[in-house]
């Protein structure tokens, strides 16, 4: 991956993260606690991916 690809992947992941947060808010509002837990786990995975990508970006 070159620097531009890493930057694009970070931007794309940030958009997905924001969308996922909105989905969690909707699930909480509608009382779907079980689905909220799964969605929060996906957020944690996204956070880990962001850490890895930011580390790669720092290496450039």
Segments and roles (model prediction):
Residues 1-15:
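Short, charge/polar-rich alpha-helical segments
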Residues 2-4, 37, 55-60:
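Short acidic DE-rich linear segments
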Residues 7-11, 33-45:
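Short, charged, amphipathic alpha-helical segments
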Residues 17-24, 42-60:
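Amphipathic alpha-helical coiled-coil segments
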Residues 30:
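Conserved short acidic donor-positioning loop in nucleotide-sugar-dependent glycosyltransferases
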